[in-house]
C-alpha cells in the first residue's frame, strides 16, 4: 500500500482515562502507515487515519491485551464485508467447530481503487490460497452456484501459520488492492480456493478446498454508533464474543 491509500476508520475500544489512551498509543506506535490517532474517551471510540489493514490494528491491540471492534471505514457507501465459509464438511474440534474460515474487509480509497483486508483461519493444508470475486452471490451450492470469475487477484494468500482452531490447521492474511469501485462488488461472491485456476461453476473444478461468502455493504466511518444491537439486544462486546467464537476475527 502507498501513502495515497490512506483512509479513516473508527474502532470501539475500552478506555476510561488518558492513561488508557497513552497505552493504546504506545501499543500502536511501531505500526508503519498510521498517520494519526484520535480518541473519544466518553464514547470509547478511536479514529485512525492510515494505510494499514484493519486486521493489523485489531491484532496489534489484542497482542497488547486490548480488544477492538471496527465500527466503520471509509466514506459512506465505500465499505463492504464478506464472511467466508466452507461448504466442505469436516470437524475441527467439537468445541471450536465452525463453518467460517475467513473474513474479507473491503474499503474504497479512490475513485477506482479498493483495498481488501483478507484473513484466513482454519484451513486444512498449508500453502498459497487464491482469491477471486465471482459474478453471482448465490452460495447455495458453494462455488458451483456463484457463476463465472468476475475478478481475480494475482497475489496469493500465504497460509503457513498455525491456526488457533486445532492441530494441522493453518492461517494467513494479506492486504490486496483492485481497480474496482465498491458499489460494483455488492451482492457478488468472494471466493478463496487452493486452486490457482480460480474455480468456477463446473463440478470438476471445486475439488480443491474452497470457502466463500456474499459481499455485503458495511458502515462507513462515523455511520455506526450503536452500542446495543436492535436484533439481538446484545451489546457490541457481547456480539464481539460471539463473533470470535465463530472464527470471525
Curated annotation (Swiss-Prot):
Q: In its keyword annotation, does this UniProt entry include Coiled coil?
A: no
Cofactor(s) the protein needs: Cu(2+)
Chain segments annotated as coiled-coil in the UniProt record: none
Q: Residue limits of the HMA domain?
A: 6-69
Residues at which Cu cation 1 binds: 17, 20
The alphabetized list of GO BP terms reads: copper ion transport; removal of superoxide radicals
Instruction: Select a single GO molecular function from the record's annotations and give it.
Output: superoxide dismutase copper chaperone activity
Q: How is the cofactor bound?
A: Binds 2 copper ions per subunit.
Pfam hit, one: HMA
Which residues are recorded as binding Cu cation 2?
A: 229, 231
Q: Which cysteines are joined by disulfide bonds?
A: 27-64
Kindly give the InterPro entries that the UniProt entry links to this protein.
HMA_dom (IPR006121), HMA_dom_sf (IPR036163), SOD-like_Cu/Zn_dom_sf (IPR036423), SOD_Cu/Zn_/chaperone (IPR024134)
* Domain of life where this protein originates: Eukaryota
Q: Which GO terms describe its cellular component?
A: cytoplasm; cytosol; mitochondrial inner membrane; mitochondrial intermembrane space; mitochondrion; nucleus; protein folding chaperone complex; superoxide dismutase complex
Q: Which UniProt keywords apply?
A: Chaperone, Copper, Cytoplasm, Disulfide bond, Metal-binding, Mitochondrion, Zinc
Question: Where found in the cell?
Answer: Cytoplasm; Mitochondrion intermembrane space
Q: Which residues bind Zn(2+)?
A: 16
Task: State the similarity comment.
Answer: Belongs to the CCS1 family.
What's the stated role of this polypeptide?
A: Copper chaperone for apo superoxide dismutase 1 (SOD1). Binds copper ions and delivers them specifically to apo-SOD1.
Q: What else is known?
A: Present with 12000 molecules/cell in log phase SD medium.
What is annotated about its quaternary structure and interactions?
Homodimer, and heterodimer with apo-SOD1. Zinc-binding at His-16 of CCS1 and 'Glu-43' of apo-SOD1 is required for this heterodimerization.
State the protein's name. Superoxide dismutase 1 copper chaperone
Gene name of the record: CCS1
